[in-house]
Amino acid sequence: MKPIQTVLVLGGDRRQQSLADALEAAGLAVRTFGLGEKSARAAADLEEAVARAQAVVLPLPCTKDETHIIGAAPQIPIDRLAALFLPEQLILGGMLTASVAARLQRGGCRVIDYYKCEEITVRNVVPTVQGILKQLFEQIDYTVFGSSACVCGYGRVGRATARTLNALGAQVTVCARSGAARASAETDGCASCDFQRLPEKAASFDYIINTVPAPVLGAQVLRILKPSCLILDVASAPYGTDFAAAERYGVRALQCASLPGKAAPKTAGEILAQGILHLWEEEGYV
């Protein structure tokens, strides 16, 4: 394999600009498209930019609608972009569905979902939690200290969120399916319950932060919440909240996507760049 020297960074949010900066700092020749940049590295023609790149880095997530690259201006249809890729190119994107990955590689190029890189997902927890706190602080008019919080799910993000809220003085209840996860939450200083018992406790919460990408906050829970309760759903699609039911019951429920790009785009972009460079090294592209 030839070492990668030329990279096109395409679409996305401010993380992609930071990612491009970090790849440039690593000595790569970087061009961008669809980021709204006015620098010398910003390409004016998509076809030319793709043709000159050994690797193309797509955003995280790559798409919301499975039709267009997210955040690109002007809009870039996925199928139009895929038609430009060459067999020898390496294409990287975040949170690729099987359908999107298949369409991207139809010309024979290699496609890698960099969000499956554990280094990236582990490091990405910190800017994600910062984004959750930013959203929470913007929505509440009381202190976190002394508040009653529920965190649904106790994976990486759920655990870091619960620990942080606990450190800020919140009374945190972790709702998780796994007995091991609940035990872990209790050793971290939180209360715990399973999802069957959530309706019994729901009326006491000031806010709920959901990290589970499966239906866990339905009408049975939503109708019990106090009117001032806030839900921040930070899970990936299909999310965990019945937003239509939340609206019916007058519950404030916010779908919070791409939090690292909103709260800490510089750090989040550097995390992506570092992980991608290590991924290339492991795959023999360096």
What label would you give each PLM region?
Residues 2-3, 58-145, 256, 275:
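Glycine/serine-rich phosphate-binding loop and adjoining beta1-alpha1 elements at the start
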Residues 5-47:
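N-terminal glycine-/charge-rich "phosphate-binding" loop or analogous flexible N-terminal tail
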Residues 6, 29, 90, 148, ...:
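Residues at the starts of beta-strands that form the adenosine-phosphate
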Residues 8-18, 23, 145-165:
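Glycine-rich adenosine-cofactor-binding loop
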Residues 13, 36, 97, 177-178, ...:
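Residues in the short beta-alpha loop(s) of Rossmann-like NAD(P)-binding domains
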Residues 26-40, 168-188:
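NAD(P)-binding Rossmann-fold cofactor-contacting core
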Residues 61-65, 74-91, 187-261:
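Rossmann-like adenosine-cofactor binding region
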Residues 95-114, 234-280:
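Rossmann-fold NAD(P)-binding glycine/threonine-rich loop
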